[in-house]
Amino acid sequence: MRSSQQFLRRRYAFTLVELLVVIAIIGILVGLLLPAVQSAREAARRMSCQNNLKQIGLAIHNYHDTYRQFPWVNANSTLGGGSAFVAILPHMEQSNSFRLYDFTKSNRDPYNRQVVSQRLPFYWCPSAVERRPVPECDSDAGRAPGSYAVNIGTEDYNQYWSFFGQPQPSLDGMIVYSDARDRKTKFASVTDGSSNTLLVGETAYNLPDYLFSFGACRGESRFSFTYWCNPFPGSTACTTEYAFNPKDVAGDGIFDRGWVRSFRSDHIGGVQFVFGDGSVHFVSENINAETLDKLAARNDGEVLGEWGL
């Protein structure tokens, strides 16, 4: 009887082999589920980014309804004025911030710091990765990063073109980056059709532009200077002249400074755009370069049908 009771009270534990098997099974399940979870999270982030672009596109439409033209991107100085994203602040329910901004001063001016330092969620893609904090050692200090850039067309814009005797770029994007106020564009200027023309796309804080040569950041990389307040090309104005969605691979020796003026994203496989009609599309990084140029130009006469993504 005693032995029977002892038998009933006996407790069995996992053997080491059984425990290892259970751990292995759990590891396999985690390995199978983790990519699906990550994919679902990225899909949610991408959808949020799409909503940002839709909101920006609608704000530009409202700006056009008010002023009968698209926002003008100031090219007289890399320091002066403000970006198109500053101009549309009232249409992004940010009228108070807009009223605080002084367009007669630089976007780097301490007076405008109270506005340009704001990290506005609709100007920042949830998938974006900030490689390091915005530096506090030069005139970049205090300006919040952004994730979006207007389409200035198929050619880069050098604000010093006349000084160097270079031909003026074609300025064929939906938004004109120009030092001439009469070059502002309207929907009537988009003769290829607003549904066939890029309006705003993504940019990313992911390319080392150059090394700081002075100050507290000496020797550190400055990444892409994508500040939503800055009207300079590469910050809030991009072109299709350079590689589309370029990636800087450490150690491969391949880098083009022009890449900082290319549309790019931290999404996998492509870049999102809001077109002139307000529709948002994900454009594959494998798109034909000629096709991308046709989408960037507002008036080249090349109207695309089913161009594909």
Where would I find each of the regions flagged by the language model?
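Surface-exposed loop/linker segments characteristic of extracytoplasmic
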Residues: 28, 43-309
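Coiled-coil-like amphipathic alpha-helices with heptad-repeat character
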Residues: 4-6, 36, 41, 213, ...
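N-terminal leader/signal peptides at the extreme start of proteins
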Residues: 1-16, 65
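N-terminal single-pass transmembrane signal-anchor helix
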Residues: 11-45, 55
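Intrinsically disordered, low-complexity segments enriched in polar/charged residues with Gly/Pro
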Residues: 6-7, 19, 257-262
